[in-house]
Amino acid sequence: MKFTTYTTFPEQTSNESLWILVDSEQLQSNLNTYQINNLESILTATQFKANFNETLPLFGQLSTQPHSQLLGLGKAAELQAAKLAKLAQTIIKSAQNKFKHIAIDIAALPVEYHYLFALSLTQAAYGYDEFKSTKNEFVLQQVDLISSQTSLDENQLALVHAVQSGQSYARDLGNRPGNICFPEYLAEQALALAAEFPDLLKVTVLNEQQMADLGMYAFLAVSKGSERPGRIVTLEYQAQLEQAPVVLVGKGVTFDTGGISLKPGLGMDEMKFDMCGAASVLGTIRALCEARLPIHVVGAIAAAENMPSGKATRPGDIVTTMSGQTVEILNTDAEGRLVLCDTLTYIKRFNPAVVIDIATLTGACVVALGKVLSGLFSPDDTLAAELQQAGEQSFDRVWRMPVIDDYQELLDSPFADIANIGGPHGGAITAACFLERFTRDYRWAHLDVAGTAWLSGSAKGATGRPVPLLMQFLANRVSTNG
């Protein structure tokens, strides 16, 4: 979906439908620029008050655009960012199967929300029908945004288009089933991205023999139970090689049965989403390539499948990580931290400026924060603040959680340097504390997206989060560093 901005309604246009956002406090003044026939009688007859998400079709009363509607904002001055998605869904649901080209007058919308509203439109327009015999009839391609004043300059529009591309790509990857999207498939996707952007991307793929040569036995303890071999994939975005890179590390467990510590059968199908951290890294790299931001970034994907078999790791097994630390694996369903710890050690070779790992790591984080906020863990106050700011700007929000030494003793093992679980309490925190032991040589943050990477129920599917957050974070660094 492509966006164009205008200061007034264009006289020469191919748009087929017009939506006018209206403030309940300034209903008449919002409509002064349009010659709407019988406006007073229409408002009186319908009792339209421009309450939030209230719609009023004009049924040909606007001569310049016969297919036009009003959409209420309520009191625009009190509008919250959380409501933008609902407005976007109302417009997209009405338009996307009918019109190729629509216009939306956003003059009544607070200027600071213009970027988020455009982004919300792209998110609402996403549909996944790859394996459906009958495809979705989505025809909407072009949206004109009209406002005499807007924050959507050329750079902001480019960022919207890039995030749309990357987030949709991440959602597609997340929605694909485990029999299609397995570790080698993720590696193939990375190589395909490099072929699409050969001037920007360098991709390296490690196989299991190479991992063994590097001593990555925590990672291999997860992948050994599956017939699908694991892969570690790095994608280097080479726009500014003289900079120390931002490294993004994604958990890519393409299907998680729990291994020998088998998960319950109910809802296990959703464990195809356990690679959404990796999907978000691939999506962010795609968005970077689309936006061509001048920044050095490395994406790393820890791709494995966690399956039970005669070769699978047993509870109580002890392995040596690439860092040299030993781990007692008390629960094979705490596998994400095992593939991540070796990957977090491996990426030290890039001499990173900062490292952010993204993982659907713990159910405990879902219990703590639900499906609204991602968990943010970092011992670095400055880095944490930058991520929180980017989350607010992109409305891909996070909540900072503790990662402090007080919790480390919960990971003590009588037989190894560390256990891979820390008992029944504070599970999201002890998981982050486990990872922290492998990240002490660089600035690091951990995003637990177990609650935000996908939705269940009628809206079931991958969300593509936190691609908007990560892209905003990177764009902010470009702006700050020039």
UniProtKB/Swiss-Prot annotation:
It comes from the Bacteria. It catalyses: Release of an N-terminal amino acid, Xaa-|-Yaa-, in which Xaa is preferably Leu, but may be other amino acids including Pro although not Arg or Lys, and Yaa may be Pro. Amino acid amides and methyl esters are also readily hydrolyzed, but rates on arylamides are exceedingly low; Release of an N-terminal amino acid, preferentially leucine, but not glutamic or aspartic acids. PROSITE patterns: CYTOSOL_AP. Its cofactor is Mn(2+). CDD domains: Peptidase_M17. Presumably involved in the processing and regular turnover of intracellular proteins. Catalyzes the removal of unsubstituted N-terminal amino acids from various peptides. This is Probable cytosol aminopeptidase. It comes from Acinetobacter baumannii (strain SDF). The gene is pepA.
